Amino acid sequence: MLQSNEYFSGKVKSIGFTSSSIGRASVGVMAEGEYTFGTAEPEEMTVVSGALKVLLPGTVEWKVYTAGEVFNVPGHSEFHLQVAEPTSYLCRYL
């Protein structure tokens, strides 16, 4: 079953699903802006198109991830994103 989610006044939208090949996940698009997300469990984020400038927990330097690149976020933490152009992503819940 698909589950639609909307965050930050509609600037981030995602569709959650469960797949036998990758497990529980969501795909979505982020409009330009700055966002802070909290995690309940570890997440693996793959940039599908565009780019995300990311500040991960415990780090002091922002890093840019582009299409095809992956980063991991620990559970029970926050991470910060800067988005300069509409960017799509795949989030796997680990």
Swiss-Prot record:
Q: Which Pfam families match?
A: Ppnp
Q: Does the keyword field hold Transferase?
A: yes
* Record's keyword terms, sorted: Glycosyltransferase, Transferase
Q: What EC number(s) does its UniProt record assign? A: 2.4.2.1, 2.4.2.2
Q: Which GO terms describe its cellular component?
A: cytosol
Cross-referenced HAMAP family: Nucleos_phosphorylase_PpnP
* Family recorded in the similarity comment: Belongs to the nucleoside phosphorylase PpnP family.
Q: What does this protein do?
A: Catalyzes the phosphorolysis of diverse nucleosides, yielding D-ribose 1-phosphate and the respective free bases. Can use uridine, adenosine, guanosine, cytidine, thymidine, inosine and xanthosine as substrates. Also catalyzes the reverse reactions.
Its protein name is: Pyrimidine/purine nucleoside phosphorylase
Protein's organism: Salmonella newport (strain SL254)
